Structure formats: structure tokens, C-alpha cells
Swiss-Prot record:
Consists of three domains: the N-terminal catalytic domain, the editing domain and the C-terminal anticodon-binding domain. InterPro entries: aa-tRNA-synt_IIb (IPR002314), aa-tRNA-synth_II (IPR006195), aa-tRNA-synth_II/BPL/LPL (IPR045864), Anticodon-bd (IPR004154), Anticodon-bd_dom_sf (IPR036621), Pro-tRNA-ligase_IIa (IPR002316), Pro-tRNA-synth_IIa_bac-type (IPR004500), Pro-tRNA-Synthase_IIa_type1 (IPR023717). The lineage of its organism: Bacteria, Pseudomonadati, Pseudomonadota, Gammaproteobacteria, Pasteurellales. This is Proline--tRNA ligase. Its main location: cytoplasm. It comes from Mannheimia succiniciproducens (strain KCTC 0769BP / MBEL55E).
Length: 571
């Protein structure tokens, strides 16, 4: 491709509204342009990368035995009503009417559509297992689209759905997809972790996220220093170690009128924060027990996902109103604690090991100090309630935990029969009776993969693609002062035609620009291999080569250049 014949729209300055590196560089490199909030045009360089990512995904999915289909973006409301998600889904689901006043949605996901398709096309257990996938546009009406294509309203996703007669068959396909995803992200050159995850609104039992490690990530990824253990922080098990110390001083009621937070209590009374607890009141699961107290250590954070799974806690999880707390307990939220508390109490594992700790007295402006379990208050139910912190023991007993930020680029679920049961998706079983199919689903955010690769691989000059396989071009020909030198122009043209004939994706910068501008643009868009042709070097029979990934330069003998590129460039 010649730059003179190409839509080469690079920017020197970073747009003010671009917050993260990938958004900044995708705009500057001329990969995308905004059209409206959360909506982007993809320009030629962006499309080249996007299609390469799709091709790698498609190759690995086909290799796994999955079969490609294509389903509509526009979906009839009846399917969502049938599954029960018409009422459950929030404002992210864009709903509209056609000219016949029939309800439709712009699909944020395709569980309903694929379940409907398969129940129409598959009738016998002999046709299963079946794994169908598509690469398709999705739309979620995000309240705050941000970070460019990382969290846009319209995006491209690869979503696959498998259908089975048994849980064992589902597990076998799930394992294949886990490995397939690992292969995909390895081929893309990404530093990623597959982590245990919560199933969220999709539903189901087992679930893994594939997280690209990057400081700009929105998720906390937890993994062990000495094993393969990895989990989303929502699911990572918090282990409490040690034994509870014997009680010391007697419990003491203290006036604390100006200490309504843990920070104020610690500061005013010189109390170690690990000797304090937070008493959090949440809505209970039954009318008989409308409020439940969850107690964690003062320096820990409540994990709402874990809390919601407790049978005593309402789902969806919700903190209690302060007025309800005051009416039931008689004290405000800054003065709550386990002693004489008249509602069910659940404490975190680490709290169960505490002794001589401080907590609210359930009287406004008062706290108890030197509280001890079993001496001053009965030991309540114990559960894992908190987020892990760095340095916690790994749940598998190997090493300690590290926490890094991650960007979710893939997610696989064992759905079970959530959708097939709701939508009566059955096949004839071996015994001739109707059998509800068991499902799995497997998604990759294709547009998000592109942004994630940039978040993880860039420098002050621009993008560094982690693999030649997804760079928009693999070789850049940069002829210096070509329009003033016949020898430079002739050799550049010859090299360009030769590389094209060899199947190399090459960009030939034939613009009338200063060399510095040409170098900057090629580094900005991340071309991995740059061939720099200068008149003096040509006279000496040499060509300059620069590697974008390492920034190393070297002189290559002109007659050895093609062999050098063949050995170093992935065609």
C-alpha cells in the first residue's frame, strides 16, 4: 500500500477527551474516529488490525470444531420475554418498535436467538454436542461510554454457544474452549490470565474470565506467586490464618461522639485499624429477617458478590436504608457493632480470629473497646465476606496473592439449562422422551482485544503491536528524499514490488514529507519492521533496518536484505 493512495489520517496532538492510552493512540494513529457517544468509525488502519484479530479467532475456533453462523443484530422482544430477561435487563437494552408497532431490541448478546435457532433446527440427541459461533456487532446502551472502544455502546464480539445432553459433555467442550481461548490470546501476543469468575447476569455455574494485564484495567485480577491459581477479585477466596489470642483487658464502653468512621476512630483513640471492625447492615432474604449485619475488619472491604450468595442476604444485594437501621437497632450507621445486636450477624473469617477489638456499641456516640468473642458476645456465623488483599495466602496453599489490574477480553460460562429450560429447547433423548439441552457460552470482545493490545504494548512514540500477525502492516519502506533522488526512488519501487509479490504486507511511504515525519508516523501506527533507504547508504550497498519492538537499528547489505526480512518478518 502506498501512503499517497491510502487514507493515512495520523494526528500530532492527543485529543483532550481521550483518557486512556489505547483511545489516545487509536485516534492519533488514524485507526478510529468518533461519530457519537460510544460510536466509532473504523478507518483503514484500524480495520486491518480488526480483521487480523478476527482471522486468528476464526482459525482457532474452526480448529476447535466450532461452526460459524451469523445471527441478526435486531431481535424480536418475544424471545427476551420468553427467557425472562425482558424485565430483568436494565436500560442497557435498547428497545424499539417497527412500523407495525412490534417490539424489538438491538442485541447486546445472543443467548435467546441461538436457543431459538437450535430448538428449531436440532431435534435429536444424535445431533449433539454442537458448538456454534459468530463474529457480530452488539449494542449496549452504556450510561457512560468511555475509554474509546474499550467501553463503547456498539462493539464487535465473537460469541459461541454449545448444546449438550449431559453436564459431562458440556464440561468437555468447556475445557476445549478454555484451551482455544488460551491459544487465541497467546497467538495475539497478549500477557493474560485465565481467572475464576462470577457468572453475573448471564447466569450458570462455572465461569472463567480471560484478563489482559494492564494498569488501565477496570478489574482486579488476583493470582498466586507460586502456582497457577488465578481469580477475579469478586471470586477470590480470602483465607484467614492463625489463632485467636486470649482476651486481655475487660470490655469498656467509651464515649466517641466525634468518631463516626473507622478513620476517625483510629485517629482519635490511637487504635490500630486491624483492631477495629465495620458493621454493615444489608437487606435480608426474608420478611422475618429483613436486616442482616455483616462484619468485616476495619481495613478490609466487603465483597458484595460473596455476600449476595449467602442464604440470609437478599438478592440482588442491597444495603439497608439508614432510617430502617435506626428504627430497628436504635443507632446510626457510625455506631454499630456485634454486642447486643438484635438482628442476625455474619462475620468474616478474619474477624473470627480477632480479640480485644473495637466496635460500635449500638448507641449513638459510643463504642465498645476490648471486645472478645465468646466472653463478651457469642461467636456468630462465619463466612468469607471480604475482598482479598496482596500478601494473603493463596487458597490453594501455594504462595501468596498478588493483585494486578486487568482488562476482560474473554469470558466462558457453563450456562446449564437456564435458557433452554425457560425457552423449552429440547431434543429427543435416547429413551425417546424430551430432553432439555444443557448449554455453554463463550465470548471474546474483538474490538476490546485491539484496545487491550495497545494498552499493554506501547511507548512514548506510539503503538508496539505484540505480534506481527495483528500489525496493520508488517514492513514500512521509508525512502529518504525519494523525490530528489532517482536511485532511492528506483530501489524503493523495486523493493516494494518484490515484497508485495512475496506476500508481505508492506506500506510504502511515498509522500513528499520530511524523513522525521515519516519515521514518526510509521512508529505511531506500530509497523514492526522499518526499511530506511538513503542515497549515501545505497552508494555503499547498504540499507538501514529498524525494529519497532526493540528500537534497534542495523545496517544490512543490500543484496542480503530480502533474506534478512524473510528470516525476521512473519508473512
Amino acid at each position: 500500500m502506498r501512503t499517497s493512495k491510502y487514507l493515512f489520517s495520523t494526528l500530532k496532538e492527543t485529543p483532550n477527551d481521550a483518557q486512556v492510552v489505547s483511545h489516545q493512540l487509536m485516534l492519533r494513529a488514524g485507526m478510529i474516529r468518533p461519530m457519537a457517544s460510544g460510536l466509532y468509525n473504523w478507518l483503514p488502519s484500524g480495520i486491518r488490525v480488526l480483521e487480523k484479530v478476527k482471522n486468528i479467532i476464526r482459525e482457532e475456533m474452526n480448529k476447535s470444531g466450532a461452526i460459524e453462523v451469523l445471527m441478526p443484530v435486531v431481535q424480536p422482544a418475544e424471545l427476551w420475554q420468553e427467557s425472562g430477561r425482558w424485565e430483568q435487563y436494565g436500560l442497557e437494552l435498547l428497545r424499539f418498535n417497527d412500523r407495525g408497532n412490534r417490539d424489538f431490541v438491538l442485541g447486546p448478546t445472543h443467548e435467546e436467538v441461538i436457543t431459538d435457532l437450535v430448538r428449531r433446527e436440532v431435534s435429536s440427541y444424535k445431533q449433539l454436542p454442537l458448538n456454534l459461533y459468530q463474529i457480530q456487532t452488539k449494542f449496549r446502551d452504556e450510561v457512560r461510554p468511555r475509554f474509546g472502544v474499550m467501553r463503547s455502546r456498539e462493539f464487535i464480539m465473537k460469541d459461541a454457544y454449545s448444546f449438550h445432553t449431559t453436564k459431562e459433555s458440556l464440561q468437555a467442550t468447556y475445557d476445549v474452549m478454555y484451551q482455544t481461548y488460551s491459544n487465541i490470546f497467546t497467538r495475539l501476543g497478549l500477557d493474560f490470565r485465565a481467572v475464576q469468575a462470577d457468572t453475573g447476569s448471564i447466569g450458570g455455574s462455572a465461569s472463567h474470565e480471560f484478563q489482559v494485564l494492564a494498569s488501565s484495567g477496570e478489574d482486579d485480577v488476583v493470582f498466586s506467586t507460586e502456582s497457577d491459581y488465578a481469580a477475579n477479585i469478586e471470586l477470590a477466596e480470602a483465607i484467614a490464618v492463625g489463632e485467636r489470642a486470649q482476651p486481655g483487658a475487660a470490655m469498656q464502653l467509651v464515649d466517641t461522639p466525634n468518631a463516626k468512621t473507622i478513620a476517625e476512630l483510629v485517629e482519635q483513640f490511637n487504635l490500630p485499624i486491624e483492631k477495629t471492625v465495620k458493621t454493615l447492615i444489608v437487606k435480608g432474604a426474608t420478611e422475618e429477617q429483613p436486616l442482616v449485619a455483616l462484619i468485616i475488619r476495619g481495613d478490609h472491604d466487603l465483597n458484595e458478590i460473596k455476600a449476595e450468595k449467602l442464604p440470609e442476604v437478599a438478592s440482588p444485594f442491597e444495603f439497608a436504608d439508614e432510617a430502617d437501621i435506626k428504627a430497628k437497632i436504635g443507632a446510626g450507621v457510625g455506631s454499630l457493632g456485634p454486642v447486643n445486636l438484635n438482628i442476625p450477624v455474619i462475620i468474616d473469617r478474619s474477624v473470627a480470629l480477632m480479640s480485644d477489638f473495637g466496635a460500635g456499641a449500638n448507641i449513638d456516640g459510643k463504642h465498645y473497646f476490648n471486645i472478645n468473642w465468646e466472653r463478651d458476645v457469642a461467636l456468630p456465623k462465619i463466612a468469607d465476606l471480604r475482598n482479598v488483599v496482596e500478601g494473603d495466602p493463596s487458597p490453594d496453599g501455594k504462595g501468596t496473592l498478588l493483585i494486578k489490574r486487568g482488562i476482560e477480553v474473554g469470558h466462558i460460562f457453563q450456562l446449564g439449562q437456564k435458557y433452554s429450560e425457560a425457552m423449552n429447547a429440547t431434543v429427543q433423548g435416547e429413551d425417546g422422551k424430551p430432553l432439555v439441552m444443557t448449554m455453554g457460552c463463550y465470548g471474546i470482545g474483538v474490538t476490546r482485544v485491539v484496545a487491550s493490545a495497545i494498552e499493554q504494548h506501547h511507548d512514548e512514540r506510539g503503538i508496539i503491536w505484540p505480534s506481527d500477525a495483528i500489525a496493520p502492516f508488517t514492513v514500512a519502506i521509508v525512502p529518504m528524499n525519494m523525490h530528489k533522488s532517482e536511485s532511492v526512488q528506483a530501489y524503493a519501487e523495486e523493493l516494494y514490488q518484490t515484497l508485495l509479490a512475496q506476500g508481505v504486507e508492506v506500506i510504502f511511504d511515498d509522500r513528499k514529507e520530511r524523513p522525521g515525519v515519516m519515521f514518526a508516523d510509521m512508529e505511531l501506527i506500530g509497523v514492526p519492521h522499518m526499511v530506511i533507504i538513503g542515497e549515501k547508504n545505497l552508494e555503499n550497498g547498504e540499507i538501514e533496518y529498524k525494529n519497532r519492538r526493540t528500537s534497534e537499528k542495523q545496517m544490512i547489505a543490500k543484496d542480503q536484505l530480502l533474506d534478512f526480512l524473510k528470516a525476521n518478518v512473519n508473512v
